[in-house]
Design a protein with these regions (language model features):
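Fe-S-dependent hydro-lyases/dehydratases of central metabolism
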Residues: 1-235
Length: 235
């Protein structure tokens, strides 16, 4: 069991994905084989449940057996909002817990990052690739389709329009999330910006539609960017 101690707080412009990309940068896609990663520390308390789900989901990229977060006040708040408060049981690490290894991550030091072809651990800062032209953008998937994720994207799009040479699609996590985003006007902002909304289901991340063009460049918020997973090994 490996302790991942999170301290500090994410800067504006950084998202939860930065945390797991930093893990991939350090550990690599095979470095986590046989390991269980337990995320603890003051930085964890600031991460809401969907954010923790993103990190846990992408523990698979590390080769991890599983990833664990505490069932703390954030989980309590989430279950209460879902009308399931009675299901909450606090589950925290023992104060004297012993670990096989420890990884320290100061969230305040993280920069916006991106995983480049063709392995999830080929991590670079956004500054390294920001001038590259792209043909396709996909927003959503299991790892970035929560209310907060899509609302942030809509905020960026507000008052702008997708470039005529770019195909941009978005898939929301669930019907509940979709209705909340519609209620608050975020879906309308995306539609006005020229973003095409996809059905709530598996899709572009596992090559069910939206396959990139030959030798094309796609930017996706989805996980598992292994070669060919999007449907075209040349992209």
């Amino acid at each position: 069991v490996v302790k991942v101690n999170l301290t500090g707080e994410l800067k504006p412009g950084c998202n939860t994905k930065e945390i797991i990309l930093e893990m991939l940068r350090r550990v690599t896609i095979k470095g986590g084989l046989g390991n269980v990663y337990e995320y603890v520390g003051p930085g964890v308390a600031k991460l809401e449940v969907p954010a923790r789900a993103t990190i846990s989901n992408m523990g698979a990229e590390l080769g991890a057996t599983t990833s664990i977060f505490p069932a703390d006040e954030q989980v309590h708040k989430f279950l209460k909002a879902q009308g399931r408060e009675e299901a909450y049981v606090e589950l925290l690490p023992d104060e004297d817990a012993q670990y096989d290894d420890c990884i320290e991550i100061n969230l305040s030091e993280l920069e916006p990052m991106i995983s480049c072809p063709h392995q999830p651990d080929n991590v670079m800062t956004l500054k390294d690739v920001e001038k590259r032209k792209v043909q396709q953008v996909f927003i959503g998937s299991c790892t970035n389709a929560s209310y907060a994720d899509i609302a942030k994207a809509a905020t960026v799009f507000k008052g702008h329009h997708v470039n005529e040479n770019v195909s941009c699609t978005c898939a929301v996590a669930s019907k509940q999330t979709y209705r909340e985003l519609m209620r608050d006007g975020y879906v309308d902002i995306l539609l006005q910006a020229g973003v095409r909304m996809l059905e709530i289901a598996c899709g572009p991340c596992c090559a069910i539609g939206q396959t990139p063009a030959t030798n094309g460049v796609a930017v996706r918020t989805s996980n598992r960017n292994f070669k060919g997973r999007a449907g075209n090994p040349t992209a």
